[in-house]
Amino acid sequence: MNLTILDTNLEPLAILDTYESLIWTDRYQAYGDFEIYESVRDDGLLSMLKQDYYLENTDSDHIMIIEQTQISSDTDSGNHLKISGRSLESLLERRIVWGQKILSGSFQNGVETLLNENIISPTDANRKIENFIFKASTDPYIVALK
């Protein structure tokens, strides 16, 4: 299983194809997660596995975001790196809605309004998450929700 390391602009930086352990869990109705366990090496890998960088798996439809990097040292087994995180949709947890917001209209329009005002094109440019888009659903059940 090959992983591509992506920077915050989703530009590929490197391929990660050797590791001691990889757990990659896709979930249907919850955030997926991953954990990589690898010995520390001198090929610059550590500098590319930064918090808020992304990992793309050739065997998955989900992109994961790196949330934690830990280095552990052991006299017997040497230095090891543990990288973990969750699937990209977990980014929505990082945003709050400022003030009270009253929504009217369809469910889909409400979701679009909240995403636009807090992630896609907020008034405070520091709150914007690049490359985040809203794609309206054509599913008749979603469109019919009020």
Question: What is the predicted role of each segment?
Answer:
Residues 1-105:
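Assembly/oligomerization scaffold segments
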Residues 80, 86-146:
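Charged- and aromatic-enriched interaction segments used to assemble
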